[in-house]
């Protein structure tokens, strides 16, 4: 009986693909070696311990309909579009060894005519006249009896968009999260004009088969029907939830300040697991009562633009004479935390 398993996703949904990955990883036999190939439409994928408000331009992501997805492995933030080919290698211990999966990817690139080398712990690079350029980045996860290595191959990614979403507006965040390292990158199409996702997947698959000396048929995972994977529905619900993608951020503090025609405002937030645990408001407004009331109401509020806006606007019932100021404040706060 074969110990290999090959899965290919037809979905471009990052939450779907990461849920599939998680389910396979949890239920696979310890003797199995798995290759999962997939790709995501416009998404910023952050590491398990990262703060999305620090790593990402969340406002621009919302404007451009770019999703946020938190993965279960560590490492930094990356932007995915359909110009990325994603791979995941899984195996039980003691056989799990990320150098094996790295070798398979390097062999696949070599078969396509690209000579690449491993650089540091996570990257694959090619040598160019301008120096080493990164074509692949990886992250890893291990449990007591198994491990996985997942990563991306930059095929024809829109590299201009990397900076759009991974270089956030300067916010006054004093964060405990891990700041991503920005790397010099290159697309494989610069080296292999016309290369396709399907060709890259085929090359990785053939290198996978060659390493283990076995061939198997691929299982196609489609979003058209719920995958036959244990606990997939629950895992997808968690993976797509605000509580996981945003709420799992490390604790951080945020200072907002603005001057309006009616006075200056400073708001200080302490945030844990996406919830405001402490809020302070300072103002030189002639009527500070609405701001003082707001500080109390914000404690326990989710750190979400819509929730903060609702909380600000709810004060209009108590302070109707300050309706215009409160609406202006609500719009500003919502915009500042997007």
Curated annotation (Swiss-Prot):
Q: Which InterPro entries match?
A: aa-tRNA-synth_II/BPL/LPL (IPR045864), BPL_LPL_catalytic (IPR004143), Lipoate_ligase_A (IPR023741), Lipoate_protein_ligase_C (IPR019491), LipoylTrfase_LipoateP_Ligase (IPR004562)
- Which ranges carry the BPL/LPL catalytic domain? 29-216
Locate the residues binding (R)-lipoate.
134
Instruction: Give the record's pathway.
Output: Protein modification; protein lipoylation via exogenous pathway; protein N(6)-(lipoyl)lysine from lipoate: step 1/2; Protein modification; protein lipoylation via exogenous pathway; protein N(6)-(lipoyl)lysine from lipoate: step 2/2
Main subcellular localization, coarse class? cytoplasm
Q: Which residues bind ATP?
A: 71, 76-79, 134
According to its UniProt record, which reaction does this protein catalyse? L-lysyl-[lipoyl-carrier protein] + (R)-lipoate + ATP = N(6)-[(R)-lipoyl]-L-lysyl-[lipoyl-carrier protein] + AMP + diphosphate + H(+)
Q: Which domain of life is it from?
A: Bacteria
Localization terms from the record: Cytoplasm
Q: Which UniProt keywords apply?
A: ATP-binding, Cytoplasm, Ligase, Nucleotide-binding
E.C. number(s) listed in UniProt = 6.3.1.20
Task: Give the matching Pfam families.
Answer: Lip_prot_lig_C (PF10437), LplA-B_cat (PF21948)
Q: Which GO terms describe its cellular component?
A: cytosol
Give the GO terms filed under biological process for this record: protein modification process
A GO molecular function held by the record: lipoyltransferase activity
In the record, the note on similarity to other proteins reads: Belongs to the LplA family.
Subunit details: Monomer.
Q: Describe the function of this protein.
A: Catalyzes both the ATP-dependent activation of exogenously supplied lipoate to lipoyl-AMP and the transfer of the activated lipoyl onto the lipoyl domains of lipoate-dependent enzymes.
Its UniProt miscellaneous note says: In the transfer reaction, the free carboxyl group of lipoic acid is attached via an amide linkage to the epsilon-amino group of a specific lysine residue of lipoyl domains of lipoate-dependent enzymes.
Q: Which protein, by its recorded name, is this? A: Lipoate-protein ligase A
């Amino acid at each position: 009986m074969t110990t290999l398993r090959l899965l290919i996703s037809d979905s471009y949904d990052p939450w779907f693909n990461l849920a599939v990955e998680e389910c396979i990883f949890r239920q696979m036999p310890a003797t199995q070696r798995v290759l999962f190939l997939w790709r995501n439409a416009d998404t910023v994928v952050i590491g398990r311990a990262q703060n999305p408000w620090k790593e990402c331009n969340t406002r621009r992501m919302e404007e451009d309909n770019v999703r946020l997805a938190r993965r279960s492995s560590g490492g930094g933030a990356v932007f995915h579009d359909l110009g990325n080919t994603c791979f995941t290698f899984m195996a039980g211990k003691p056989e799990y060894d990320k150098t094996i999966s790295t070798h398979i990817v390097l062999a696949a690139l070599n078969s396509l005519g690209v000579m690449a080398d491993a650089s540091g712990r996570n990257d694959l690079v090619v040598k160019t006249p301008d120096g080493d350029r990164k074509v692949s980045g990886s992250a890893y996860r291990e449990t007591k009896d198994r491990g996985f290595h997942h990563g991306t191959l930059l095929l024809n990614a829109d590299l201009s968009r990397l900076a759009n979403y991974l270089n956030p507006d300067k916010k006054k965040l004093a964060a405990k999260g891990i700041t991503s390292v920005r790397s010099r990158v290159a697309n494989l199409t610069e080296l292999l004009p016309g290369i396709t996702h399907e060709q890259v997947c085929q090359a990785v698959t053939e290198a996978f088969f060659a390493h283990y000396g076995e061939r198997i048929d691929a299982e196609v995972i489609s979003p058209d029907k719920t995958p036959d994977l244990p606990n997939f529905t629950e895992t997808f619900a968690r993976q797509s939830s605000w509580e996981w993608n945003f709420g799992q951020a490390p604790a951080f503090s945020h200072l907002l300040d603005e001057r309006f025609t009616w006075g200056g405002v400073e708001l200080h937030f302490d945030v844990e697991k996406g919830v405001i645990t402490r809020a302070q408001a300072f103002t030189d407004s002639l009527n500070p009562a609405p701001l003082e009331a707001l500080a109390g109401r914000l404690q326990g509020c989710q750190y979400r633009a819509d929730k903060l806006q609702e909380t600000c606007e709810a004060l209009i019932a108590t302070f109707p004479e300050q309706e215009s100021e409160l609406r202006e404040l609500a719009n500003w706060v919502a915009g500042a935390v997007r």
